[in-house]
Amino acid sequence: MLKVFNTATLKKEEFKPIVPGKITMYVCGPTVYNYIHVGNARSSIAFDTIRRYLLYRGYDVNFVSNFTDVDDKIINRAQEEGVSENAIASKYIKAFYEDTKPLNIIPATTRTRATEVIPDIIEFVSDLIDKGYAYESQGGVYFRVRKAGNYGLLAHENLEDLEVGASGRLDDGALALKEDPLDFALWKNEPRQVIKWDSPWGQGRPGWHIECSVMSTKYLGYTIDIHGGGIDLAFPHHTDEMAQSEAHTGKQFVHYWLHNGFVNVNNEKMSKSLGNFTTVHELLSSYDDPMAIRFLMTATHYRRPINYSSSELERARVELDRIRTAYRRLKNADFKIGDDPQIDQLVSKQTAAFVEAMDDDFNVANALAAIFELVRLANSYVDSGDVKDKSAQEILRQIAELIGVFGISGLETKKESLPKKIELLLKKRETARINKNWQQSDQLRDEIFSLGYKVSDSSNGQQVRKI
């Protein structure tokens, strides 16, 4: 029996989909004004892992996510670079796909841009005005928070204790346009010569919160099974989504709210605003094992924070290599025809332990413990010298399938060995860098490049890949 921790109730609850065997799932996507950082990737990986487990359990998962492609940050970046907002958004949407592909994140069933649903947004906002939940003020439209009966549920705060402008997206002067400081923008008046649309209230653009409500309703229906995102989105973003969606439809918006924890650097949340972030784009260019990055992100329970560092990444790689090595040892062992019932029973026991762990709000620590029991079994089976082909294949199948729930692939693939000349040049370059002979270091880097290999320097040392 699958149980999930529901942020709305702060309890683990038995998971019961609206339609048996089918799951509707919405997860908030990035604002595309820059490359995604490791913290953004953590959310994508966490919910990809949850999605993979639901698929493993036999559910049909309809997974929808968004790109916020109209926002002050995008407008500001476009003005800085002298290009259109669409050019900025398109550039970083392309980068998102390029950066998430090596991390083995399954593409969403539907992934849409906010600018693609503007007519739907205008219709949604108009309905809220008609029902008295929203009002127009000088070309903008705002939601009446105090009219929503359960506002603040996800924040677990009284209405009076909620922080005005908690999203950090409150425009200067916006407070003066509101009936109540807690009211939030559904549609923003836009007098500048930037991206905007005609509406019944004048030219403007949507507020941040409305797009996810519209996309979820449009592609998944009035009520969905799971809504996910980072814990920082619980208030105000998801709180506002819930309020406006339930006001619009008169129905419960989400059955289960799931939120992932932060990625921290030196015990402080990684964020672009703090400047303590590492982009996935940078990391992938300097680190040659994307599956180790994925393993680091998925080996910690999704609700717990991760303290990111190069040493933690290296620790994750070492752990993953234990699985890879055991898998390859057994794969390449000498088999005898037949099976071993005792081995098969041990495999079944660990598979059941994996399911039991993941059914407990996706307890990856206990699930990994089951996988490592299979790893130990694989090694001891090879050491026994009496490996039966059917039992060996079952161990291999289960290791690959279970670690595949974590999104880890390529267990059979060995890292490509480097030509001896490249290895020699790398050693010379490492010596030059230790001696701070930067000129020689650069010359050796260029020589390596001329031979078809690119060298990047990182806190993990020299990383080299074939061009």
Curated annotation (Swiss-Prot):
It comes from the Bacteria. InterPro entries: Cys-tRNA-ligase (IPR015803), Cys-tRNA-synt_Ia_DALR (IPR015273), Cys-tRNA/MSH_ligase (IPR024909), CysS_C (IPR056411), Rossmann-like_a/b/a_fold (IPR014729), tRNA-synt_1_cat_dom (IPR032678), tRNAsynth_Ia_anticodon-bd (IPR009080). Keywords: Aminoacyl-tRNA synthetase, ATP-binding, Cytoplasm, Ligase, Metal-binding, Nucleotide-binding, Protein biosynthesis, Zinc. Its EC number is 6.1.1.16. One of its GO terms (cellular component) is cytosol. Zn(2+) binds at residues 28, 212, 237, 241. Gene3D superfamilies: Cysteine-tRNA ligase, C-terminal anti-codon recognition domain, HUPs. Signal peptide: none annotated. GO terms for biological process: cysteinyl-tRNA aminoacylation. It is found in: Cytoplasm. It catalyses: tRNA(Cys) + L-cysteine + ATP = L-cysteinyl-tRNA(Cys) + AMP + diphosphate. Binds 1 zinc ion per subunit. ATP binds at residue 272. One of its GO terms (molecular function) is cysteine-tRNA ligase activity. SMART domains: DALR_2. A motif ('HIGH' region) lies at residues 30-40. Its cofactor is Zn(2+). Monomer. Belongs to the class-I aminoacyl-tRNA synthetase family. This is Cysteine--tRNA ligase. It comes from Oenococcus oeni (strain ATCC BAA-331 / PSU-1). The lineage of its organism: Bacteria, Bacillati, Bacillota, Bacilli, Lactobacillales.
